[in-house]
Amino acid sequence: MRSVAKHSARIPAHCVGSDRRRQSKKPKVRAIADRLGTQQKLARDVPERILEVEQIPEEESATAAEENIMIEGDACPINENVAWQTLCQEARGDANSEPALASYLFSTILAHRSLEDALAFVLANKLRSNVLLDSQLLELFSVQYRRDHSLVKMAQADMQAVMDRDPACDKYLQILLFFKGFQAIQAHRVAAALWRQDRKPLAMLLQSRISEIFHVDIHPGATIGEGVMLDHATGVVIGETAVVENNVSILHGVTLGGTGTFDGDRHPKIGSGVVIGAGVTILGNIKVGANSKIGAGSVVLQEIPENSTAVGIPARLVKIGTKAEPSLSMDQVSGLDSLNYNI
């Protein structure tokens, strides 16, 4: 009988390892492209396309392959908006240095054509719920930004305010994606626009989500100027008839509240250039004059003149005559040296 040679089905370990390494590289990169393509479909007004991935020689490592992802097409175009160009450059840089963020940065920044498109996408994904879909919110924000271009102008001013005043911030990208004070103000601006359009139930729904997600409670009837920074933001409460003028800095735990049950004009009016320290409570329809400074933990019950510093419970004037905008320098302690701290 003719013998038949038997061959082992076992494959040498070194061959298996080599084969697996070759097979794992391109699929890993392609998986990133697939994820980006899926997320891209959520972005409004972005043409249908796939993420092009540069062909990587097999000798290169998987990490090198990820770092060589090439995003092509007409998203994130160069335009006259310097802030948008900067955001795109920062996003590309972070995607290259940290490939794990490539998918996230593509869906939030690089898949979009403008600041307003990216902002609408970020806010929609932050504020969505099981019964309020991100696609609904994306349409809502996008329509409001197209209808009122001042919303985008104010967003840029707020972004620049954070960059100028917060030493912990070194990229515009951080502000848009990670700073909830900035995000809360931008979402409030859309809620306020809806309120002015007499779409009050929708405005209140949006305000409720802002409060739940960001822990910032701003009534949609409140008026917020541009160049405003909510630093840390947690616990900020701003009532319906409050007015916050331009270039104001507000730290966490601040309340601009009313008193009693009167339903008229009952909330504080904050002048331009004011800085309000952490934990401050300002009650009633009173004016805090421009370029004033309210020390942390103070309770303000009376009007504060312009260019003044007030501290304490209840707050009292400790300095008058400061002309520089303290909101820009974030200086909360100068002018307090002469106080008697003895108890």
Where are these regions (language model features)?
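Alpha-helical subdomain
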Residues: G271, E306, R316-L317, K323, ...
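Terminal amphipathic alpha-helical/low-complexity segments used for targeting or macromolecular assembly
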Residues: R2-R209, E325-I343
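Structural signal for interior beta-strand "rungs" in well-ordered beta-sheet cores
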Residues: S211-V318
